[in-house]
Amino acid sequence: ANSLMLVNREAQPANQPPPGVAGGLGIYDVSSPSRPREITFWRCGGAGVHRFTFDGRYAYISPEMDGYVGNIVMILDLADPSRPQEVGRWWMPGQWVAGGETPSWSGRAHRCHHPIRLGDRLYVSYWHGGFVILDVEDLSKPRFVSGLDWSPPFITPTHTALPVPFPLHGRRVMLAADEDVAKLAPGSPSFLWLVDITDERRPVPFASFQVSGIDGSPQPEFTGCHQPCEKITGTEIPVAWFAHGLRIVDIAAPHAPREVAHFLPAVPEGHSRVCSNDVWVDDRGLLYLIDRGRGLHILERV
């Protein structure tokens, strides 16, 4: 957006960065796409920034910050991309240990995965803390509206909280994708939820979608749901479904979501199975499906 490209940098336990390489957010000028130029690098503490969304001016990010346990919500103003300015932040009570708070959970189980903005609300996935809805009418003071945490009893963490930008049968609906990793116990793969947020103070899960052939028996991680396309153009939602490839789910009848198309890539060389990680759609309707191991497929709906 606005000829800017943002790239998160994050240290992973299995792939520690070399000395001197920090986590944060890289900001690039891509007005000449073949010659991207780094404008600046915004640094943060801990492992860095896990994921983000960007509307052309504000970046809604999930950084680790000194004094906090796990990633928090932060809003950066990139009006001057050479000087990113923090506008506001929010964290789940218990994360700010430097401020005297004590988490009610162990480790980094409750942490911001990433925020998605629609209007004056942020819809924030919070891993094993479920999801929260924040009022950002005043960007400097994000305010808690509501939240819902279903793990436990469900065993997988929430990866994406994605509001549908149009009503379905007169109701406001949010999609919630749980990620098939970091399970609280052995169990069946994660799936996609539909949540009624017509009364946003009282979100109500009312439907779900799981791929066919799942019988409830325990499966390895990276089998189930991961990420829905965060650009919604209609009721057909492309979803990256790890070992099951790309699934296109029609939510036109929200109480009965159904699969209308799918694509299973070939297993990448050097890997034992498919691991479809992310999917995006461009203005032409082309789909871009990335494998977590290696490879990119460009697809069209027929």
What positions do the PLM features span?
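Feature marking well-ordered beta-strand scaffolds used for ligand recognition
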Residues: 1-302
